């Protein structure tokens, strides 16, 4: 069975100020939530560890399993699929202790404090025996590689890469993960985590393999778009259900402020060419979405209007605007104050303009 292990030290960690602030906020919130549970007698539960989340549970590139999608230091590792079955990992001692600690009102790892799958129990629930939960079925993350060609200010990817024993999942391993997804009856696979999926040298085989074994599964990819630049990769991408292009601005300068080493010109061309490649084959899938993180340097109304016009011009299916708080100094106050409410419809992402239903701007 999988056994708890101490978090491995990250070699040469980056020390960006916003990461340090984020760590302080997480620790402070963890302490507050633990105190709140002690005073009220109400513990917590984790939707992901109950098997009811469509996100968060992640199979990493080295086949370790994490309970969350921001496991930069390995503190969320619940087991290793090279040593144990998924059932042994998911119901094993590490995951069980996380569930038990939460039920007692303890926040076992700081990332729990800001996780969307954390739920507060009622007093009645807190007095009941801890339910075992079930195996995930709604969705999981699958990380084919932890390598990336850009360096986002809000992402501690290099720390995670130093924790991984393998930075690239082999094709044989991926095939086994597809079999696992079929065994679990997963409704969705999010083919993403802390790396750039299209950097994998095997991407041309990976996506068709997943689709062949999981014909009815929704497969979602997130990419910065820069290396989705050949017909071979575009052909592989047709095996997915949806592709989110993370492009956070309308020019190189704007994008590179958050996503270092990025290129708006290349990413925009990648979106345009993927639309053309799909449409030339008479297809409507995958759904192609421009994912636009909102910061205080890219959120002026005129800028968003221009982004919508540019998205419309190349024919993507939608553009979505996502508020974020990392880095904290880049937070979009225009969004928080409701000054961007005329741009698309409100949903769980933030704001979204869907050209298929809303039409042209």
Which functions belong to the PLM regions below?
Residues 42, 108-111, 144, 148:
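Short metal-coordination and nucleic-acid-contact micro-motifs, chiefly zinc-binding Cys/His arrays
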Residues 94-110:
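Immediate flanking context of iron-sulfur cluster ligation sites
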Residues 1-84, 88, 104, 164, ...:
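Radical SAM enzyme [4Fe-4S]-AdoMet core and its adjacent flexible, acidic
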Residues 106-126, 292:
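Membrane-interacting alpha-helical segments
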Residues 64, 96, 118-121, 249:
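Active-site/binding-pocket entry motifs
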Residues 46-47, 75-78, 101, 117-242, ...:
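Conserved alpha-helical substructure of the radical SAM core
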């Amino acid at each position: 069975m999988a056994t708890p292990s101490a978090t491995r030290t990250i070699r040469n960690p980056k020390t960006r100020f916003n990461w340090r602030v984020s760590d302080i906020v997480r620790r402070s919130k963890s302490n507050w939530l633990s105190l709140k549970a002690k005073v009220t007698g109400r513990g917590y539960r984790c939707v992901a560890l109950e098997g009811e989340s469509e996100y968060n549970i992640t199979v990493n590139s080295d086949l370790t399993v994490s309970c969350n999608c921001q496991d930069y230091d390995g503190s969320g590792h619940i087991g290793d699929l090279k040593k144990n079955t998924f059932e042994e990992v998911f119901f094993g001692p590490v995951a069980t202790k996380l569930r038990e600690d939460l039920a007692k009102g303890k926040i076992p790892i700081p990332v729990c404090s800001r996780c969307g799958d954390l739920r507060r129990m009622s007093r009645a629930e807190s007095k009941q025996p801890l339910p075992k939960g079930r195996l995930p079925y709604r969705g999981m993350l699958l990380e084919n590689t932890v390598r990336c060609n850009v360096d986002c200010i809000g992402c501690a990817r290099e720390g995670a890469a130093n924790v991984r024993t393998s930075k690239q999942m082999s094709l044989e391993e991926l095939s086994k993960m597809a079999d696992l997804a079929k065994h679990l009856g997963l409704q969705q696979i999010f083919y993403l985590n802390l790396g750039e999926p299209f950097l994998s040298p095997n991407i041309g085989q990976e996506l068709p393999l997943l689709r062949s074994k999981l014909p009815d599964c929704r497969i979602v990819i997130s990419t910065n778009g820069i290396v989705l630049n050949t017909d071979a990769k575009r052909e592989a991408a047709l095996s997915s259900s949806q592709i989110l292009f993370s492009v956070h601005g309308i020019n190189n300068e704007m994008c590179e402020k958050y996503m270092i080493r990025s290129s708006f010109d290349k990413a925009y061309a990648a979106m345009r060419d993927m639309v053309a490649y799909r449409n030339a084959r008479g297809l409507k899938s995958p759904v192609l979405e421009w994912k636009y993180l909102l910061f205080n340097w890219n959120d002026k109304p005129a800028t968003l209007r221009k982004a919508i016009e540019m998205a419309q011009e190349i024919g993507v299916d939608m553009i979505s605007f996502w508020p974020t708080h990392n880095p904290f100094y880049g937070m979009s106050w225009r969004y928080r104050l409701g000054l961007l409410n005329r741009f698309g419809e409100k949903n769980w992402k933030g704001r979204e303009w869907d050209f298929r239903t809303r039409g042209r701007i």
